[in-house]
Each structure stands twice: as structure tokens, then as C-alpha cells.
Amino acid sequence: MQKIVFIDRDGTLIAEPQPDQQVDSLAKLDFIPKAISAMRKIAEDTTYELVMVTNQDGLGTGSFPEDTFWPAHNKMMSTFAGENVNFAAVHIDRHFPHDNSSTRKPGVGMLTQYFEASYDLTNSFVIGDRLTDVQLAVNLGAKAILFMPPNGLAAVQSADVSGLTEAMKQAIVLQTGDWDEIYEFLRLPARTALVERNTKETQIRVELNLDGRGRADMHTGLGFFDHMLDQVAKHSGADLAIHVNGDLHIDEHHTIEDTALALGEAYRRALGDKRGISRYGFLLPMDEALAQVGIDFSGRPWLVWDAEFKREKIGDMPTEMFYHFFKSFSDTALCNLNIKVEGDNEHHKIEAIFKAFAKAIKMAVRRDINELDNLPSTKGVL
């Protein structure tokens, strides 16, 4: 299915002059910094269809004659075309706000054709500098990129929290005033996975965003296990939520093993075909302990474990399950793991392992925007 980037015009691609907010002469045509170069890269480096959607209040009336609009608009279009930026469609609504027209943003009256099954609106984006652009994304079932140039309109509007509905907050995936950041976001889409694993022993839900901010939401029923999984999220930079309902009244084994299996599966799915990743990835000290974790997302599971624990449990987690956790992760993530730790304090040793594990993952999944067509293997597949 075809994904689309719906792009606002005034305030997003070109400056919106004040106070009349009308680009009605060539003298008023001023491109937003980096918009042309970023749009060229988006057009050349991604598969999104580019669609312009703009409200032009009263176009064709005495307050905004057509002959003052088209010269600047056509110059803008020819400038983009000269940089290999070709819009599949340009939708212009001419109504005033008080007309309450369904074709005026955030209405979707001009855009009904994109609800056809051949379009993937769920993975499409609306880029604009107004909250009406965010609402348009909600109405389309797409995601929103709120463009916020310094002292721009969106910066003022977004300060009014009451203007943002919960649906709008959920729709916004990026707020920025930098077109280069928009390009990188579209070129490097978030790598996410949702895994649900349900057996007679455990019910597990894992939500993973490899390109998150290190946010953690752990509820396994085992406090120390939650603490270790928090380290994975924090030190890998991934957003990770794990909710488990396990048979802890019998034993901790199923909860820990099945969580690792689901987590490994989430990483395997989120990595996709692994193009552009570093693939390999850590020595990490914690007080007297030193952990070494090497990882290779090779497509082949293997675990080398050189770690000895003298206590039966640390917190409420059996130490015998440490090996089992990483073995299960390796099995479903299809990765090689080489883990070694030295130290005296048992808590420090296992926490150092989990932190080093997270850092190794962070290194291995890092993408190079200039290597996205390259697979880090001479075999041609991972």
C-alpha cells in the first residue's frame, strides 16, 4: 500500500507573512530554511507520495484575488520541481473558517480518495505548523509532525494545552522546527514491535520501540526482574513496556523464561531485515564488578556464559534463571551472546551484565543513514 506525506504550505514550506497571512506577491515568497533541500531528499530517498494540502482563506474573492495568488504559488512549485520534488496532488481549499466547510482543514472533504484500500494512512504523516494540521492527521487516521519554527504559530498554539485533545497528543510523533530532522525521521522510521505470548502458565505483552527515549514500564510480578529490565530500557535507549501475568504461585521459572522469549521475539521483529545496522556491539564496570557482553544479530542463536553466582536468589529472582533468561532471549532474537562477568558483589555482577547487555544492544541496532541500503554481511542476508 502507498504511504503519503500530506504537507501544509504556508508556515511549513514557505513563510506565512504577517499580519495578513497571504502570499499574494512574489516579493512575499520566502522559503522556510532547509525546506527545499530536505524535500528533495525525502522525494529521492523515500517511497512516500507527496501531497500538498493548504487552506487559502477567500481565494478568488475580493480579499484575495486569484491573479495575486498564482504567480507566487507557481514559482514555489517550479522551484520544488527544479529540485526533483514533484507533488502527486495539490489540494487548495478556498473557504473562510466561518463557512464550516468539510473541505477546509482539518476536514477531509478534499481527501476522500486517500481512504481507498490502496493507501496506507496508518503509516502516513501530516506535516504542518497548526493544530488544525494535527487534527487533520487524527481525522485521516495518520500521524502528525508538528512543525514549530522559532516564534512560529504552532509555538504559540501548542502552549494552549486545552487545544490539544488526547487523540491529538497521541497522533504527534515529532515536534521540530528543523526540516533536516523531519527528513531523518521519515528516512529512519521508528522500529517497533508488539508481541503477545499466551500460554497456560503466562500471559505476556511486550511493546518495544528501538528508537525511543529509554522509557520503561515493567510489571512482571518480580521486583528484582523489573529492576533488571528497567536497565535494558534505560541503557539501550529503547522504550520498553512488559506486562506479565505468570504462575508465580508455582515458581518464577515460567515468568522469567517466557518474558525472555517474548522480548527476544520483539527485538527480532523490530529489527526487520537489519539493513543499515551496526550489527555488533561492551565492557561495563559497576563498582568492583566488570561485565563483558558481546552481541551479534546474526540470525543464529548461541550463548556463551561465563558467570558464577553463589547466592540462590538476588531479591526475589533465582540466580539460576539469569543464564536461562539470556539463553531464551538468544533463541528468539536469533542472536549470538557472549557474556562474562567478574566481581564480588552478586547484585553488582548481574546488574552490570544487564547494563552491558543494554549498551551492546544500543551499539548493535544503531543505524547509519548513509548505509540504509547495505546489509552488514557478505552473505546478503541476516
Curated annotation (Swiss-Prot):
Q: Extract the SUPFAM superfamilies matched here.
A: HAD-like, Ribosomal protein S5 domain 2-like
Q: Which UniProt keywords apply?
A: Amino-acid biosynthesis, Cytoplasm, Histidine biosynthesis, Hydrolase, Lyase, Magnesium, Metal-binding, Multifunctional enzyme
Q: Mention any Pfam family matching this sequence.
A: IGPD
Which co-factor is required?
Answer: Mg(2+)
Region entry Imidazoleglycerol-phosphate dehydratase, spans: 191-382
Write down the InterPro entries for this protein, in alphabetical order.
HAD-like_sf, HAD-SF_hydro_IIIA, HAD_sf, His_synth_bifunc_HisB, HisB_N, Histidinol-phos, IGPD_sf, ImidazoleglycerolP_deHydtase
Locate the active site: 8 (nucleophile), 10 (proton donor)
GO molecular-function term, one example from the UniProt record = imidazoleglycerol-phosphate dehydratase activity
Instruction: Report the subcellular localization.
Output: Cytoplasm
Similarity comment: In the N-terminal section; belongs to the histidinol-phosphatase family. In the C-terminal section; belongs to the imidazoleglycerol-phosphate dehydratase family.
In Swiss-Prot or TrEMBL terms, this protein is called: Histidine biosynthesis bifunctional protein HisB
Give the species this sequence originates from. Spirosoma linguale (strain ATCC 33905 / DSM 74 / LMG 10896 / Claus 1)
The organism that produces this protein has a lineage beginning with:
Bacteria, Pseudomonadati, Bacteroidota, Cytophagia, Cytophagales
